[in-house]
Amino acid sequence: VESVYELHSVSKFYDNVRALDVISLSIGTGEITGVIGRSGAGKTTLLKILAGLELPTAGKLLFKGDEIDRKSVRQLRRVATILFQTPLFLRGDVYTNVAYGLRIRNHSRESIGKMVVEALSLVRLDGFEDRDARRLSGGEQQRVALARALVLDPRVLLLDEPTSNLDRANASVMTEIIEEEGEKRCVVIATHDYEQIKKLADRTIFLEAGRIVEVGATDSIFSGPLLANMENVYTGVSRLVDGISHVDIGNGVEIKAAFSRPGRVVVHVSPEDIILSKGWVETSARNEFKGRITAVEDLGPIARLKIDTGKSFTVQITKRSLIDMGLNVDSEVYLSFKASSVELV
C-alpha cells in the first residue's frame, strides 16, 4: 500500500490540554483506515490534522513525503476533504451546495453541471439538484455533504461519525458508498460504530487519551483482548425522564440509563451484562427488547451471539446455556439489562 501520510511524534495541545500525545503512524491509499476510541480520545483532532485544519503543536506531519507546515498546509487542504457529523449548508438548493467548491476553483459552468450530476449519482441522489438542501432528511443531507466532498475528487476523504445519526436505510447506503470510495482514494473514518469499522476498515487505529493503544489489521485489533468487551457501543440522543436518561440510538430502539445527561451521548453495554431468555421475564431490568439471533460465535465454553432488535446487540452466554435453550441462528429471543449496566463512553 502506497503511503500517503506519515506522522512522526505528533502532539497537539489546546491551551494546557493535550489532545494528541506523541502519535507516530503511516496511512496508505487504496484502503480504509478506521479510528476508534472513547469520546475525548483524540479521534476528531487527528482527522483535523490530517485535513490540514490544524497543525501539530510538536512533531512532523508528512503528506506524500513532504512536510506540512504553515506554508504548505493550503495545498493539503485542496486534496484532503473532511466530512463532519453535522454538515452545514448554504441557503438554496442541492445543486448550489454541491457546486460551491467547484465554483471557487473556477471550473466552467458546463463542467460544474456535469460534475454535480455525477457526484449526486455516486451518493444515490439522482435528480435532487433542485431540492432545498436544508429541508432534506438527515440521511439525505449527509449524502449531499458527501457529494459536495466527492465532487472535488479528493485524494483523501476524512469522515467523522458519518452514520451516527442515520436510520438503517441511509446508514446502509452511506456504508456502501464509503466502501466504493475506499478503492479509489485514502479514506479515514473516525467512529464509535464498531460494526461499521469491522465491515469497512482494512486497518484500525485505537486511541485512548490521545495516545495510540494499538494499530494494525482490523481483524487482529477486534479479536485481541483490548476490545473484547467493547461491543455494544451506540451513539444516540438522551432526554431526561424522572432523572433517568432515555437514549434514542435509532431504529426505534431506546435505552434507559442510570445517569442524568441530556443531549448527544455515547453509551456502552457489556455483553456479559445482558440477560437472554426465550420469553418475557419479569425482572427489575429497565431495558427489555425482542429480537432475532443473526450469528453465533463459538468461543469454547462461551458463545457470543449477535441479536437484531432494530439495533444489533452482542450477548455472551455459556455454551451450556446455548444448548439447553436450543438457540441457533434465526431463533427469536428476548434480552434485558439494567439501567445501571449502561455506561457513558
Language model feature labels by segment:
Residues 251-295, 316-345:
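Glycine/charge-rich catalytic "coupling/switch" loops of P-loop NTPases
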Residues 157-161:
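Catalytic Walker B motif of ABC-type/P-loop ATPase nucleotide-binding domains
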Residues 110-128:
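Conserved ABC ATPase "signature" region
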Residues 131-134, 152-153, 183:
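Conserved signature/switch motifs of ABC ATPase nucleotide-binding domains
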Residues 51:
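Helix-to-loop junction immediately C-terminal to a conserved catalytic motif
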Residues 59-67, 76:
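Conserved ABC transporter NBD signature motif
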Residues 171-183:
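Helical segment within the ABC ATPase nucleotide-binding domain
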